[in-house]
């Protein structure tokens, strides 16, 4: 009997595979980093073949590490960096252009034109999103208009579009399945979150032929079956969700009002709002939290473009540290950033500012400033940006009393304590922090019969540590005011 679930977690800087038991515990994993390419200012690309090859390799290696065969795996779940856009030949499966990553800002001018023409209100009403280079539609249009012959080939039905989940599914199934799920579709700027279908008016606005687009399924569904030659036997793909929605599921945030925040390359805070979509007055996004049996649970989301990427920049860009884990020890030594603020607007600012032309800066440098203070400011910048999102949720009338956290950065205890101090709310870290992969494993397991329902899944969530705020309210206000001043100074309209 097949006792395990294989979760593919394809991220912005690495591909991972984690094997989970039926109890939701990781039993084997493998991870491979791959390269990001920055061909021009504000452009971010991936080699789609590297995405596929690293994904396939980590799946094979994860099974090998536990001594498992494909027959031991009941189902595969796929979770992924969202919005990243790929286009490939329908016959050969060959990509026609590098993947354009969610961080890429090349379409900022086109987005500004659409806003100036008055399209944003209609687009937002249909999709829950804002017109921004972050989302897939303008990236896809750019590929069609800038790769020779691409638009003509698309109109002839010769090309396929997909976000990373869809592309991996196509490759895993040998080109037999061109499908995505409702969470990934909801991030394209082409999907109507009310009708739960591709929106013809939006396809016309962005000039996207419908033949490019995949079929949209629930998060727990029969997506396809893997090619036997890839992993040693055919395995059904039964779960799919974008990375942040997968983390919402993995954190068992199934009740309206529950909030999770994931700290990876970026930071993403999502709050479950239940069966009705809630429109934010503070430029948060309305999105699909998950869809099961055709029934949607909606969410509001705040997206921060640079979180862990700030630490990567400190390591790789200006080489202040050799390893990311050094940041915690340096912050403990420093105790405080001593008035230094790092605003990591390397590719603009996300929610609630949505300023693609903002650029990063460091403020408050003195003769006494050293590596410790700058690294500490980098960690604090992630917490301040989380406070920006929390304030937006509060102003929308949905203040969370606790925040469930996950992702690679949450092992940093110093940062978690500063986070709870600057937010003024309890921060809860679960036993299993790889909740993105866990969430999609849950979806695959739900379809495979491992779990009865969402209550059954929620019973597997366990708290590892709760962080409580100790900072005085006056000090919290002073620090956050300094951050707000720093952000004002990097805004494009400043």
Curated annotation (Swiss-Prot):
One of its GO terms (molecular function) is ATP binding. It catalyses: glycerol + ATP = sn-glycerol 3-phosphate + ADP + H(+). This is Glycerol kinase 1. GO terms for cellular component: cytosol. GO terms for biological process: glycerol catabolic process; glycerol metabolic process; glycerol-3-phosphate metabolic process. ADP binds at residues 12, 16, 265, 308, 408, 412. Keywords: ATP-binding, Glycerol metabolism, Kinase, Nucleotide-binding, Transferase. Belongs to the FGGY kinase family. Sn-glycerol 3-phosphate binds at residues 12, 82-83, 134, 243. Key enzyme in the regulation of glycerol uptake and metabolism. Catalyzes the phosphorylation of glycerol to yield sn-glycerol 3-phosphate. Pfam families: FGGY_C (PF02782), FGGY_N (PF00370). Pathway: Polyol metabolism; glycerol degradation via glycerol kinase pathway; sn-glycerol 3-phosphate from glycerol: step 1/1. The keyword Oxidoreductase does not apply.
